A protein has these predicted regions:
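A C-terminal functional module that forms or caps the active site or interfaces directly
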Residues: 206
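N-terminal charge/polar-biased segments
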Residues: 1-13, 234, 240-261
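Short capping/connector residues at structural and topological boundaries
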Residues: 29, 238-239
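Thr-Gly-centered strand-to-loop micro-motif
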Residues: 201-203, 229
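Generic, ordered loop/turn and secondary-structure boundary motif
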Residues: 25, 234-235
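Alpha/beta enzyme core
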Residues: 10, 15-55, 60-84, 89-199, ...
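Short acidic/histidine-rich active-site segments
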Residues: 227-234
Length: 261
């Protein structure tokens, strides 16, 4: 089994995944704040920063852009996704396979699971297949663990987020990507619930530098392994500046204010 902490998507046991699956999940609107980011090459360039341990993208972007960056960026293949146009119960169908991701040079795979949705049984079965195939390839598995749907009344509650991290452990993920529950204490509960599965924070919508870094600082103090972030990096005019600060907080244990100095 891959040991997260000594693999291609981590650094000293810590993780900073730069995600850019937003074009499918949210649409081009997410690129409007910094229009040049609609070109995936712009974000791949950002991902060459030393702080970034992997870049998560969908199949088409990986096919067309990753070959130019394979020496500088570790590819995390995001194997499922759905558009913002979908109006039914939360569901994220599989769009490509572990085998094909491995052919393209992926170092790891990622998969979203919406526990509590009416589509939970299909998503669990898809995740089982992906997890077992990833094991055969020696690739770590990151679960985007987002409980939501008819079975979930409030997906931001502390116990719901902790349940999400526990589900990632129970189903065999190496890393659980969960929402930040809003406090260090609540994050500690999510980390404890995950056992020895690493827990990373979802970056979420863009906020100011200090607020963002304070949440990352709290995650690290709670025993989290880092974060998976998109908009809070590449929606900034100077993404390298925030990555410099994240490097200090995640890998060096700096506080938010210190990291911005």
């Amino acid at each position: 089994m891959p040991q997260i902490g000594d693999d291609a998507i981590s650094r000293d046991g810590k993780v900073l995944i730069l995600a850019m699956d937003h074009g499918l999940e949210h649409g081009p609107v997410d690129f409007e704040p910094v229009p040049e980011t609609i070109d995936p090459s712009t974000v791949f360039d950002v991902a060459t920063h030393d702080a970034v341990t992997a870049m998560a993208v969908q199949k088409g972007v990986a096919e067309r852009y990753y070959p130019s960056y394979e020496d500088d960026v570790a590819l995390l293949a995001k194997l499922n996704g759905t558009s913002n146009l979908w109006m039914g119960e939360p569901y994220s169908p599989k769009n490509w396979t572990v085998d094909y991701a491995a052919e393209l040079g992926a170092e790891a795979v990622g998969y979203t699971v919406y526990s509590g949705s009416n589509h939970e049984p299909e998503m669990y079965e898809d995740f089982r297949e992906i997890q077992e195939n990833a094991r055969a390839h020696g690739m770590p598995v990151v679960m985007w663990s987002y409980p939501r749907g008819q079975g979930v009344k409030n997906d931001t509650k502390d116990d719901v987020i902790a349940y999400g991290s526990r589900i990632a452990l129970e189903l065999g993920a190496d890393v659980a990507k969960v929402k930040y529950p809003g406090s260090k204490e609540a994050m500690e509960w999510a980390v404890d619930a995950a056992g020895n599965t690493k827990v990373v924070m979802s970056g979420g919508s863009k906020v100011d530098d200090l607020s963002f870094l304070r949440s990352v600082e709290a995650v690290m103090e709670a025993g989290g392994a880092g974060l998976a972030v998109g908009r809070n990096v590449w929606q900034r005019e100077e993404p390298e500046r925030i990555l410099d600060a994240l490097e200090k907080v995640i890998y060096e244990g700096a506080g938010a204010e210190e990291a911005l100095d």
